[in-house]
């Protein structure tokens, strides 16, 4: 309330807000009364359905933009937009738009790919080589469980490391973030929960143990290294060993996240049936359908976009009302987006196998086609990495496997030993299950799409 009063009184020059604030009726009313001189949309790719990090709440910004005169100054910035995303942003903002594109080339990033056949080979390489890299940096993993596994392994071999993920309490996250800025650890092992808003100029290395979902994700995450312009090491591990379904091991996890990004169609239908009876608030939808808040928010955003429901106000209460005569749910849009994301994932896999300069490959994907002499990767001037490690480290890894037990705050749904193989099912995130075979990730899926492995 105090901030709104100060803004209305003209006492604030620059006001930073989260897009979710645009869902607050008091805030919407206040912005209409403020003497605004400019709107800046940071991370503008998030307002595009085709953007790599689309967030429905960002669409609320467009609702505000539409209330303003066509000539009102708006600046939208992003470091990761393809031509398709750029065109989508332009069409949503509307009006006369000028586009300024800077170079995306990061010549100080030394790009390498290491192909492995197991998680153990990743761990062994890190143990043997991490201390040879100057400075401090980040190691990105695909799951919360792996942040703990890798950080504990590195600690086990005498490397100063700490694990970070969104499941930690806010005080612990803040402590680790401050430690990162002050070079307290050789490396912070994290999911992609760490990075947004981190502006540390001297991150000397970024290593991915799991392939990201697209070259755009990868470019954004490695772009946190070497912002001081000095050389920084960038490494991507890729396990191309085929699983029981003939799919490369490291392809399975990001593919499962893409396949399960949206709730199942039956959950959309469940929500629509409840809303046909009466208008419901978000919390009431959750209660009536027994769905989680994240699921309900995705569902209601899609239903609003397709004009199946609309938002209505009853005093200060916001509810969602079914529009009788509404069109049927168009699942083809969901499938088109899923196919597009799988295509992006395939492009990320192609990055592993490409023979062209790796930075050129990433820039081409982002529609930045510059003729530059690229010489900063293992396809050009840099030596390819070896997987050879001292036997002593193999012994330490065996000892680690015998004595390491995950302490991460995960609920064990079930565990079972079948013909000598240990199977364990963990709830690692809201609505996400991990199936682990002898403590190695076997598959990941949502609870809605889980079928027994036994």
Segment roles from a protein language model:
Residues 54-57, 264, 341, 439, ...:
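Short, conserved glycine- and acidic-residue-centered signature motifs
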Residues 19, 428-429, 454:
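Structural motif
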Residues 1-270, 283, 309-319:
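Helicase motor core with emphasis on the C-terminal RecA-like subdomain
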Residues 73, 453-454:
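Short glycine-rich phosphate-binding loop at a beta-alpha junction
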Residues 109, 139, 435-436, 441-446, ...:
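Buried hydrophobic side chains on well-structured beta-strands
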Residues 207, 211-220, 226-430, 436-437:
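C-terminal accessory region of SF2 helicases/translocases
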Residues 122-123, 414-415, 443-453:
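A short, well-structured juxtamembrane/interface segment
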